[in-house]
Curated annotation (Swiss-Prot):
Any one cellular-component term (Gene Ontology): cytosolic large ribosomal subunit
Family: Belongs to the universal ribosomal protein uL16 family.
Classification via PANTHER family: 60S RIBOSOMAL PROTEIN L10
Gene: rpl10e
Pfam family, one: Ribosomal_L16
InterPro entries named in the record: Ribosomal_uL16, Ribosomal_uL16_arc, Ribosomal_uL16_CS_euk_arc, Ribosomal_uL16_dom, Ribosomal_uL16_euk_arch, Ribosomal_uL16_sf
Name of the featured protein: Large ribosomal subunit protein uL16
UniProt cross-references to Gene3D superfamilies, sorted A to Z: Ribosomal protein L10e/L16 (3.90.1170.10)
Molecular function via GO: structural constituent of ribosome
Keywords: Ribonucleoprotein, Ribosomal protein
Amino acid sequence: MASLRPNRCYRDVDKPPYTRKEYVKGVPQPKVVHFIMGNLSAEFPVKVNLVATRPIQIRHNALEAARVAANKYLTKMCGRMGYKFQIRVYPHQILREHKMATGAGADRISDGMRLAFGKPIGTAARVKEGQAILTVWVNPDKFPAAKEALRRAAMKLPVPCRIVIEQGKELLKL
């Protein structure tokens, strides 16, 4: 199986949206399993967002890695019912790759750049500058845990991020 190309091949928003799955054959499913986790029925007063600082495409495997990192830390620090966590973006953008044959005799097999549109290899979420990527709702005493969880998630993403308190700032001792 071929390895995954580096994210620098896909992170810039330089192509038009390519999202119509009904016209594209063989689009892989996104790796993101759950988009909302934690205690879904409770109300939490503090809402903290992870916000992108520039426009970018985030691949589905990076979103899943960020989700796993943040959710694991929140579960450990707040308990299973002590938080609500949501991924706010969905990977609609279909990523394509024109596979090139390499090695001995590749010139006989390969067509070069003829029909170079590419086959679908994955999906990505298009994020605008200032858009929330992840959101955590917690009680005021668990705010440091939410902040650390978002910091850990930000390390898995290909964009510099800011942590913004959207709701409940007056309840925190900052």
